UniProtKB/Swiss-Prot annotation:
CDD domains: FMT_core_Met-tRNA-FMT_N (cd08646), Met_tRNA_FMT_C (cd08704)
Binding residue positions for (6S)-5,6,7,8-tetrahydrofolate: 110-113
Catalysed reactions, semicolon-separated: L-methionyl-tRNA(fMet) + (6R)-10-formyltetrahydrofolate = N-formyl-L-methionyl-tRNA(fMet) + (6S)-5,6,7,8-tetrahydrofolate + H(+)
Top-rank taxon, per record: Bacteria
Native source species: Lactobacillus gasseri (strain ATCC 33323 / DSM 20243 / BCRC 14619 / CIP 102991 / JCM 1131 / KCTC 3163 / NCIMB 11718 / NCTC 13722 / AM63)
Protein name in UniProt: Methionyl-tRNA formyltransferase
Family as reported in the entry's similarity comment: Belongs to the Fmt family.
Lineage of producing organism: Bacteria, Bacillati, Bacillota, Bacilli, Lactobacillales
Name of the gene this protein is made from: fmt
Pfam families associated with the record: Formyl_trans_C, Formyl_trans_N
GO cellular component assignments: cytosol
InterPro entries, per database record: Fmt (IPR005794), Formyl_trans_C (IPR005793), Formyl_transf_N (IPR002376), Formyl_transf_N_sf (IPR036477), Formyl_transferase-like_C_sf (IPR011034), Met-tRNA-FMT_C (IPR044135), Met-tRNA-FMT_N (IPR041711)
Length: 314
């Protein structure tokens, strides 16, 4: 079976790696981001890809920066048939990409050339797209700009979040990769250059983008909430404190209240957004609290507000 160096970090990558292992590919090395200390107790956290690699006794490399590292020198000696990446999180040196005997291949979570960059799945939800997908593409020096070998589309459901799409697309990407790699061997692989006129970028989500603005309609706010679930979460400033909203629902009803006003907190919690649109909150997280459904919130702090009160700060 063909030899592979695999590079990836989150669960999206581990699903793809597991697929290569299950299919019998000879995984010579796994490269992932360094372990991180997380939480107040600074517990060491290994990436999902590292955990999968260790489970199968595969050699793991974790350079803080691959370019110029000792690890790169070792990896260059392997000269695998394929270099495969799936959500690795670093630029790869061109000389390393060229060390693959057959091809350096990336599993990308969008229908390229739409959403080049580090957050393609989040932007597909944020922009209210009805469809996303995966692309198997050649890795080149320029970010996500290589020729396309194969693509497969996936509908985005109204209740999809970035989290649910990560799970769906990791499976779709795994399966499409495993369909595509044999085509290199039998000579049937096709390559399609990307249309540069249709390129859309999806840079990593900034801290500023995490806040729900009162200039947003209920639908736009809901798209942001879904896009930032499960991480890092979208928030409003409620009573001067950060208030995360994990799940919400735009309503058909309209209100005359200005944006940021409580419409009702009787049995449900509805706030006004731009254009008189209404957003019903379903799962929330006040500062210093755990996530809770809206019923629990209304039984406590949420009962203290009154309809018509401006509760969301700019």
């Amino acid at each position: 079976m063909s030899s592979v160096i695999f590079l990836g970090t989150p669960n999206f990558g581990s699903v793809v790696l597991q697929g290569l292992i299950d299919q019998g590919y000879d995984v010579k090395a796994v490269v992932t981001q360094p372990d991180k200390r997380v939480g107040r107790k600074q517990v060491v956290h290994q990436s999902a890809v590292k955990q999968t690699a260790l489970k199968h006794n595969l050699p793991v490399y974790q350079p803080a920066k691959l370019s110029g590292s000792d690890e790169l020198a070792e990896l260059m000696k392997i000269e695998p048939d394929f270099i495969v990446t799936a959500a690795y999180g670093q630029f790869l040196p061109t000389k390393f990409l060229k060390s693959a005997k057959i091809a350096p291949v990336n599993v990308h979570g969008s229908l390229l050339p739409k959403y080049r960059g580090g957050a393609p799945i989040q932007y597909s939800v944020l922009n209210g797209d009805k469809e996303t997908g995966v692309t198997i593409m050649e890795m080149v020096k320029k970010m996500d700009a290589g020729d396309i070998f194969s693509q497969k589309a996936l509908p985005i459901e109204d209740d999809d979040t970035s989290g649910t799409l990560f799970d769906k697309l990791s499976i779709l990407g795994r399966d499409l990769l495993l369909e595509t790699l044999p085509k290199f061997i039998d000579g049937t692989v096709t390559r399609t250059p990307q249309n540069e006129d249709k390129v859309v970028f999806s840079p990593n989500i900034s801290k500023e983008q995490e806040q729900i603005k009162l200039t947003m309609t209920a639908e736009q706010a809901n798209n942001l909430i879904r896009a930032l679930n499960p991480d890092p979460g979208a928030y409003v400033m409620l009573d001067g404190k950060r208030f995360k909203i994990w799940k919400a629902k735009p309503l058909a009803e309209k209100t005359s209240f200005p944006a940021g006003t409580l419409v009702t907190n009787k049995k449900k919690f509805v706030i006004s957004m731009a254009g008189g649109s209404e957003l019903e909150l379903l799962e929330v997280q006040p500062t210093g609290k755990k996530k809770m459904n809206i019923k629990d919130y209304l039984n406590g702090q949420g009962s203290h507000f009154t309809s018509g009160e401006k509760i969301i700060d700019e």
